[in-house]
């Protein structure tokens, strides 16, 4: 729209938000909140959680809790009150996600839920384990109801992997030690840092990204600056 014109452009270009579950995290609450963050709106949120790193000592228990939460979702007509997971934006989007999931499975990942082809725009939610950063689902934007869960040995590995992405919108750290959580989140090269919560927006707080995720700002006074021009008045008594 701005091609050939002298206009300012702001771009929001997608994300691959990570979450890190430390060994001392509340696993049930973390799983419940991360399903909301990763599967709400059928996973079609640029700041939704798409990759989860879990300390190896609690990996199995967390995965069990996460699977139970996802299995409780009800895929169906969004107009029906019992539906908790609706369709993707169009059939082509569901097919693209199915291709990404199948590619990652061929690369060695293990699906925890039935891997069914999409019916129209309806995609069965999926969790993939035994994943790594050589796999498609852990490196490219998913934008649908599927998430990869990767085991890590310690905080250092978690931070390194969270930073191993060309996207950078947000991140979250889940821990009983809030001070340590803040310290770790600050080491992630992104712009929205959250501890024991995720995928939360407030109109008063700027939404922005770095790397290949965003140019410009939305929300807060920064968002207004993207759409307005400053005016200065110099007034002197006559």
Regions found by a protein language model. Name each.
Residues 1-132, 195:
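ALDH superfamily catalytic-core signature
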Residues 74, 122-238:
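Conserved C-terminal structural/oligomerization subdomain of aldehyde/semialdehyde dehydrogenase
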């Amino acid at each position: 729209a701005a091609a050939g014109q002298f206009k300012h452009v702001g771009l929001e270009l997608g994300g691959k938000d990570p979450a890190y579950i430390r060994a001392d995290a509340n696993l049930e609450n973390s799983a419940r909140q991360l399903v909301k963050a990763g599967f709400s709106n059928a996973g079609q949120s640029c700041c939704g959680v798409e990759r989860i790193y879990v300390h190896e000592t609690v990996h199995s228990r967390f995965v069990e809790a996460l699977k139970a939460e996802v299995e409780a979702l009800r895929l169906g007509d969004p107009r029906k009150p019992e539906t908790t997971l609706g369709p993707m934006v169009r059939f082509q989007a569901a097919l693209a996600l199915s291709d990404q999931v199948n590619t990652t499975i061929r690369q060695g990942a293990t699906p925890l839920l039935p891997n069914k082809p999409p019916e129209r725009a309806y995609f069965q939610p999926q969790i993939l384990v035994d994943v790594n950063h050589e796999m498609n689902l852990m490196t490219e934007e998913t934008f649908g109801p599927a998430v990869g869960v990767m085991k890590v040995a310690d905080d250092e590995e978690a931070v390194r992997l969270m930073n191993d992405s060309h996207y950078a919108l947000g991140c979250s750290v889940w821990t009983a030690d809030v001070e340590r959580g803040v310290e770790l989140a600050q080491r992630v090269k992104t712009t929205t840092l959250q501890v024991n919560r995720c995928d939360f927006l407030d109109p008063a707080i700027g939404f922005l990204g770095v790397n290949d995720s965003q140019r410009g700002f939305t929300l807060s006074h920064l968002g207004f600056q993207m759409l307005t021009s400053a005016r200065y008045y110099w007034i002197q008594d006559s």
